[in-house]
């Protein structure tokens, strides 16, 4: 297609929308990142960046982090709420809290905290949902506001550690997830001589919609019902500790796509807040939890991988609803807190890797079957003759269904021993040739052609064997059908000639990506340039900075990938910082309690027994290097 342009590529991969301006396609067809939005004139070509890393000894796949994106996301959220507070004359302030469960990597947490270093009054706190996370935030929270929110189920040790946090100078809010926690908190606080800051997670009747909707609603795993909240109030009054209840928390679920759901949830929780104030509580903080979505597919819709609102609209809705409620009840306006971890981290990381090979259909010359061949084969030849002779548009559909039916019968007859292997192979090739021709002559402008075109694209798609583990690097794509943007990193200045599916290198048929961003929709295949060993290109998986690393597992013992931090300086120069090596074979063996040292001793015994002396040293060296090597394939150079 000679009229192909870069704008066609940008539209086809929808990059202008899901990337939020952080990623793009250059005029030469290469994917770029602009990690510092304060300097949009500076960008980095991801293809060259990855190749430079490989030359310096960093094997693919590699996860690349852009910390300046983290800084930008933090400041964007704070700015949106600050502007909303000013717009609606809200009489309090805003605090952004990062739940470290989203990505606990030290680099990520420290860069998020660093985004507030220059602020006179930091607007950033940290959230922990377990004892290990609490131990981490106790050591890091002082770099921002020193506010810590403790969620999740708690035992005595967790509660004592949280209370000790107050002694260390932090402002620690212990959120009640169940009634039994209150008694323990009050007892341990008295022992330690600490006045606790309590929060209460309320279980709303309203439930948002999405993949994580079970986090909200009356059947939620966490939170207190209305009657349980009243029990907490009564218990605190009896203990003369009602002033300790300082935070109200609710959570609709992660990735809330519809702004109406957010508005309705805030409205119900706001009523809880106002009623608690009427009962004598002194709640100072209103924590809306998570839910601020990421537009993974760029469709700006209510799909589970998108969002039908922007950051400004999100902040405006929360602030305006609370303003109206507090004015209605004549209650003081609380500090607004949100826990927007996914929004902060998703965009900052991209996984780059190589294609190790492809399997592509190429039309073959097919001979007409012999006269004595089974009638079924002649029927299939007739279908091929009709489609190659350009049958009319409606006949094309009939030809397609006839050919699929005939192929199914061929397989049945082969299983019964009534067709030979060569006859089956011939039939399969004819079927592929018919499908290939149909895809070329059918048109999406005919509504009744569209579902068949989708089927044909999937049936004829190239298989790309990609050097990564879906289970390790994109577990949500496997586990919950999460959509992630995927693009070739180069060659996008020319019209894509193929459609493909991406398969990982695990020995599992589930290691296949089933959904791809394609224009303003989701398809089961992705348009790509022709790939060959002589002209290979790299693949980028985008928006993988939230949850994927910590949720990833070691299926087939593929471990953590190499990673690197990349930053632009003020002059637009690219600096590759803190390269972190991925897991070695010995590392992953150790995770499953297999001892590489004892394996080496066994290898030595086997080598001495079976290998001639002249070869022993070389064989042992290769075995040792195998244990020290990367768990992924290392042929790309």
Curated annotation (Swiss-Prot):
Q: What sort of enzyme, by top EC class, is this?
A: lyase
Q: Which domain of life is it from?
A: Bacteria
What UniProt keywords apply to this chain's record, in alphabetical order?
Decarboxylase, Lyase, Magnesium, Metal-binding, Polyamine biosynthesis, Pyridoxal phosphate, Spermidine biosynthesis
Biological process (GO), any one: arginine catabolic process
Q: In which pathway does it act?
A: Amine and polyamine biosynthesis; agmatine biosynthesis; agmatine from L-arginine: step 1/1
Q: Name one GO molecular function term.
A: arginine decarboxylase activity
Modification sites for N6-(pyridoxal phosphate)lysine: 101
According to its UniProt record, the EC number is 4.1.1.19
Its UniProt entry gives the catalysed reaction(s) as: L-arginine + H(+) = agmatine + CO2
- Entry's InterPro entries? Ala_racemase/Decarboxylase_C (IPR009006), Arg_decarb_HB (IPR040634), Arg_decarbox_C (IPR041128), Arg_decrbxlase (IPR002985), De-COase2_N (IPR022644), Orn/DAP/Arg_de-COase (IPR000183), PLP-binding_barrel (IPR029066)
Names of required cofactors? Mg(2+); pyridoxal 5'-phosphate
Amino acids binding substrate: 286-296
Give the matching CDD domains: PLPDE_III_ADC (cd06830)
Q: Name one Pfam family in it.
A: Arg_decarbox_C
Q: Which HAMAP family match?
A: SpeA (MF_01417)
Similarity comment = Belongs to the Orn/Lys/Arg decarboxylase class-II family. SpeA subfamily.
Query: Function, please?
Result: Catalyzes the biosynthesis of agmatine from arginine.
- For this entry, the protein name equals Biosynthetic arginine decarboxylase
Source species, please? Shewanella sediminis (strain HAW-EB3)
State the gene name recorded for this protein.
speA
